[in-house]
């Protein structure tokens, strides 16, 4: 079941320590009026987590995700990790559906991914295409 995290709890802070991509981003930057954490759970067991920032444009780096915006049109999946095989894919699909329902102005779904073969395989296998290669990141776009 999908959970949308909008408040910081001790459980969330502990789970964020497992973030393999962007562990340096504090919980307060992951949960605010322009940011959400989506968690896929099976009962009490966490299956996968992704963090999403809502912006007005596609970022090229983490520094582009600072601050709040008034009229976001882009959902940026900037980190994802799973505790079970296949859960990351299920989470991307469920989170996108949830965002579509909650934020109808969001038109673009992209990632801010590290330049790794693992990230490339994951996103291309799950229906994304490469949008843009940046200095230290790659943006993949989901339809």
Which residue stretches match the model-derived regions?
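Short amphipathic alpha-helix that is part of the acyltransferase structural core
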Residues: 1-29
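Short, aromatic/basic amphipathic alpha-helical patches
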Residues: 121-129
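Conserved catalytic-core motifs of GNAT/GCN5-like acyltransferases
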Residues: 129-141
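Conserved beta-strand-loop-alpha-helix junction that forms the acyl-donor binding cleft
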Residues: 82, 109-121
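A short helix-loop-beta-strand connector motif used in the catalytic cores of GNAT acetyltransferases and
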Residues: 27-48, 53-56
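Conserved acyl-donor/pantetheine-binding loop and adjacent beta-alpha core of acyl/acetyltransferases
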Residues: 51-75
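Conserved acetyl-CoA-binding loop-helix of GNAT-fold acetyltransferases
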Residues: 82-101, 125
